[in-house]
Curated annotation (Swiss-Prot):
Keywords: Allosteric enzyme, ATP-binding, Cytoplasm, Glycolysis, Kinase, Magnesium, Metal-binding, Nucleotide-binding, Transferase. The active site is at residue 128. Homotetramer. This is ATP-dependent 6-phosphofructokinase. ATP binds at residues 12, 73-74, 103-106. Signal peptide: none annotated. Its main location: cytoplasm. The lineage of its organism: Bacteria, Pseudomonadati, Pseudomonadota, Gammaproteobacteria, Vibrionales. It catalyses: beta-D-fructose 6-phosphate + ATP = beta-D-fructose 1,6-bisphosphate + ADP + H(+). One of its GO terms (cellular component) is 6-phosphofructokinase complex. Mg(2+) binds at residue 104. Its cofactor is Mg(2+). Catalyzes the phosphorylation of D-fructose 6-phosphate to fructose 1,6-bisphosphate by ATP, the first committing step of glycolysis. Allosterically activated by ADP and other diphosphonucleosides, and allosterically inhibited by phosphoenolpyruvate.
C-alpha cells in the first residue's frame, strides 16, 4: 500500500479547490498516509516546491476561495525532460502517487505522468464545468451564483435606462455556465457554443420584446463566441436602443465557495485518496447522479464528451 501522496492545484483557480485539498489531506491522514502539498501547480512540481502537510495546514481553508497551494500556467510541462525532473522530485520526497485538481489542461499533465509510470488521480476543479466524466465540476455552482448576482444588478440598471445589456460569461467552449445563469437570471437571449451566434434571430427577438413594451433586454454570451462590445454596437445600430456590454471576467473565479461546492470538493478529495489506497492510478473522479464515480483519465480526455443539455436549452427558449 502507498504511504505518501502529493496534491497540487493547476490551471485556472476555482472556488472549492481549498476544500478539495483539505479533503485529500484529512482523508489521507485519517488512513495513515503522509501528504505533501506542491505549490504553484506543475511549475512548483518541476521546481521542487514541495512541503509536508498536516491537519492544521488545512485548517480554516474550507470557506476560502482560490487555492492556498497556488496555481500557475506551465506549458513547459509538455516537455518529457521537464516531466522526468518532476517525477524525480516526487520520488526524492518518497511520494508514490499524485492528486491533481484542475481542468482539462491539468488532466493532460496527469495523463502524461501516468503514461510515464507515475500514478495520478484527477479531480475536476474549474468554473467552466467542461470536464468529461462528471455532472459538475468544483467551483461551477459558486461561479453560477456570482454570475446570477451580476445579472440581477444589470437588470436593475438596464430597466431604469431602458437599455439592452450583454453579459459575457466564462466557459471557454462549454456553455453550461451561460445557460444556467441565463435561465436563473431571466435573460432574454442566450449565445453559447452549443447554440451558435445568429444575429438576425437575436435582433428579431429583441425587437419583438421592444414591440411588446419591454423596458430592457439582457443577452447572456459565452466568452470567445464574439467580441461583446462589437456585438453591443451592432445591436444598438439595428434596434436604436442603447446597448452596453459587461465582461464579468475573473470575478467569476473568486469568492467563498457555496455549500454545494464545499461538500462536492470534500467528497471528491476523500474519494481520490480511497482510489489510491485501492491501488488505482491514471483515473479521474466525478459525480454522476449524485454518486462518486471514476474513469480512465486518458479515456476521459480523448474519448468522453460532455452531453449537451438539450432539455435545458428547450426550457430556456420557452422562458425567454
Amino acid at each position: 500500500m502507498i504511504k505518501k501522496i502529493g496534491v497540487l492545484t493547476s490551471g485556472g483557480d476555482a472556488p472549492g479547490m481549498n476544500a478539495a485539498v483539505r479533503g485529500v489531506v484529512r482523508a489521507a491522514l485519517s488512513d495513515g498516509l503522509e501528504v505533501y502539498g506542491i505549490y504553484d501547480g506543475y511549475q512548483g512540481l518541476h521546481q521542487n516546491r514541495i512541503e509536508k502537510l498536516s491537519r492544521t495546514s488545512v485548517s480554516d481553508v474550507i470557506n476560502r476561495g482560490g487555492t492556498f497551494l497556488g496555481s500557475a500556467r506551465f506549458p513547459e510541462f509538455k516537455d518529457e525532460k521537464v516531466r522526468a525532473q518532476a517525477i524525480q522530485n516526487l520520488k526524492m520526497h518518497g511520494i508514490e502517487a499524485l492528486v491533481v485538481i484542475g481542468g482539462d489542461g491539468s488532466y493532460m499533465g496527469a495523463k502524461k505522468l501516468t503514461e510515464m509510470g507515475f500514478p495520478c488521480i484527477g479531480i475536476p476543479g474549474t468554473i467552466d464545468n467542461d470536464v468529461a466524466g462528471t455532472d459538475y465540476t468544483i467551483g461551477y455552482f459558486t461561479a453560477l451564483n456570482t454570475v446570477i448576482d451580476a445579472i440581477d444588478r444589470l437588470r436593475d440598471t438596464s430597466s431604469s435606462h431602458q437599455r439592452i445589456s450583454i453579459v459575457e460569461v466564462m466557459g471557454r467552449h462549454c456553455g453550461d455556465l451561460t445557460l444556467m445563469s441565463a435561465i436563473a437570471g431571466g435573460c432574454e437571449y442566450i449565445i453559447t457554443p452549443e447554440t451558435g451566434l445568429h444575429k438576425e434571430e437575436l435582433i428579431a427577438k429583441i425587437k419583438e420584446g421592444i414591440y411588446k413594451g419591454k423596458k430592457h433586454a439582457i443577452v447572456a454570451l459565452t466568452e470567445l463566441m464574439t467580441d461583446a462590445n462589437e456585438l453591443a454596437k451592432y445591436i444598438e445600430d439595428e434596434t436604436g436602443r442603447e446597448t452596453r456590454a459587461t465582461v464579468l471576467g475573473h470575478i467569476q473565479r473568486g469568492g467563498q465557495p457555496t455549500a454545494f461546492d464545499r461538500i462536492l470538493a470534500s467528497r471528491m478529495g476523500a474519494y481520490a485518496v480511497e482510489l489510491l489506497i485501492q491501488g488505482e492510478g491514471g483515473r479521474c473522479v466525478g459525480v454522476q447522479n449524485e454518486k462518486m464515480v471514476h474513469h480512465d483519465i486518458i479515456d476521459a480526455i480523448e474519448n468522453m464528451k460532455r452531453p449537451v443539455r438539450k432539455d435545458l436549452y428547450e426550457l430556456a427558449d420557452k422562458l425567454f
